[in-house]
């Protein structure tokens, strides 16, 4: 199979749909192939930043495409559509994910919305959530991977750390260690906050 390689920004749309309609909630930036956080795959998923920092035009295009795709396939509940937004601002559809997405926590944080509750209401009662148009903060979810075979310390006291392994467990090289959630008023500050904690955690690993 030959596929065209599109230079641009990895993105996604998080949507809630019922049998009668679809509401695209957020356009999200996807973090892909970040080897500084232990990800060894060039296209490996490393988390999200919500929302995607882009123009209203591009955001609207992505949301409209996602809604059309979800409705065309008759999907119900929480669904995601992945894109690459090319350097000249054209969104290319990559795949459809008829499930909860890795961006769930960040979408909940920036919208103040319970995504599981919204999913159930859409599936059982056909109700779509009402969300605010203006988003006043950015949320980063950063997934850390073991750069080498390591023993993980106790991470339970860090409120920003999620998906926490048992203290003292051995994590193999390239396997996920944990997720970090960081909120700030702008995109770069949110990412830097997550990045700073990530470096502290990576520095606390004990090679074995």
Segments (PLM) and residue ranges:
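Short, solvent-exposed polar/charged micro-motifs at secondary-structure junctions
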Residues: 10-15, 89-90, 151-153
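ATP-dependent carboxylate/phosphate-activation module, predominantly the ATP-grasp catalytic core
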Residues: 7, 11, 15-68, 72-74, ...
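Short, well-ordered beta-strand elements within core beta-sheets of diverse protein domains
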Residues: 4, 48-51, 178-183
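A short glycine-rich, hydrophobically flanked beta-strand micro-motif that places a catalytic Asp/Glu
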Residues: 3, 75-88, 131, 151
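Peripheral (often C-terminal) accessory segments that flank ATP-dependent C-N-forming ligase machineries
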Residues: 117-208
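Short acidic-glycine loop/turn motifs at beta-strand connectors
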Residues: 17-22, 86-89, 147, 184-185
